[in-house]
């Protein structure tokens, strides 16, 4: 792992609740565009690693979808609070990785935390319906269930807001999520995934991997 300051490091893949190296052992350089300094080396996942992430996410889905909406809401709110606590670290990542001015990066952190907080409340409002039937002795009940594993592909220009929008919405609905950031901005998304782990998201409910787009689609 390459250290970037005292609190920051480039991590590896996150599968089944653990940070692990890519099976190929390959890495790529994460570079500061302003100074061309190497910030660290991120693990480059293989298609086989993605299959492992999918398997873990399927297992995580079975656990997470059975977690009550109120408990999911509590965890999402904790993530929002933790993001605000770590505002400086998250903002610094964006400034180093993609050159966003620090004040703008801090604003993005606040916006991303607000998204988690919003979805924490929406989790409690996943209501079903009772519909009148055309038969006198029948009622129609509608229940909403998680659809499965979410693939969250995150662009480089707003890495924290857009990853938060996808991760928090998927988790709120009871789905598990595999997040893949742009290769330019892995660090800030890694930090968000680590916050999810710290705040009680169970293994497999959130996974993280790097892979180039043409490899991901195959």
Map each language-model feature to its residues.
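Short glycine- and Lys/Arg-enriched binding-loop motifs that mark or flank ligand-binding interfaces
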Residues: 1, 13, 21, 95, ...
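Conserved small/polar residues in nucleotide/adenosyl-binding loops
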Residues: 3-12, 209-216
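Terminal low-complexity tails and localization/encapsulation signals of metabolic enzymes
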Residues: 6-7, 11-41, 74, 78, ...
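Histidine- and aromatic-rich ligand-binding microenvironments
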Residues: 29-32, 41-52, 200-207
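Glycine-rich loop-to-alpha-helix module at the N-terminal edge of alpha/beta enzyme cores
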Residues: 37-127, 137
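Short, cationic motifs built from Arg/Lys/His that form the positively charged side of catalytic pockets
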Residues: 69-72, 180, 215
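Rossmann-like NAD(P) dinucleotide-binding subdomain of oxidoreductase/dehydrogenase enzymes
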Residues: 128-212
């Amino acid at each position: 792992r390459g250290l970037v300051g005292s609190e920051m490091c480039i991590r590896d893949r996150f599968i089944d609740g653990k940070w692990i190296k890519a099976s190929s052992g390959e890495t790529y350089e994460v570079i500061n565009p302003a100074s061309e300094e190497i910030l660290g080396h991120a693990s480059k996942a293989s298609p086989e690693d993605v299959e492992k992430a999918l398997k873990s996410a399927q297992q995580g889905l079975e656990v997470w979808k059975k977690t009550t909406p109120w408990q999911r809401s509590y965890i999402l709110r904790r993530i929002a609070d933790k993001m605000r606590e770590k505002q400086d670290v998250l903002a610094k990542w964006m400034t180093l990785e993609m050159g966003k001015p620090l004040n703008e990066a801090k604003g993005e952190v606040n916006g991303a935390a607000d998204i988690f907080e919003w979805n924490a409340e929406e989790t409690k409002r996943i209501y079903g319906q009772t519909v009148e039937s055309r038969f006198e002795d029948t009622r129609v009940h509608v229940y909403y269930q998680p659809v499965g594993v979410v693939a969250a592909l995150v662009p480089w220009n707003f890495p924290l807001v857009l990853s938060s929008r996808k991760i928090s919405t998927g988790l709120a609905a009871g789905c598990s999520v595999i997040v893949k950031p742009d290769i330019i901005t892995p660090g800030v998304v890694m930090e968000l995934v680590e916050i999810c782990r710290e705040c009680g998201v169970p293994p497999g409910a959130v996974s993280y991997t790097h892979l180039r787009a043409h490899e991901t689609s195959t």
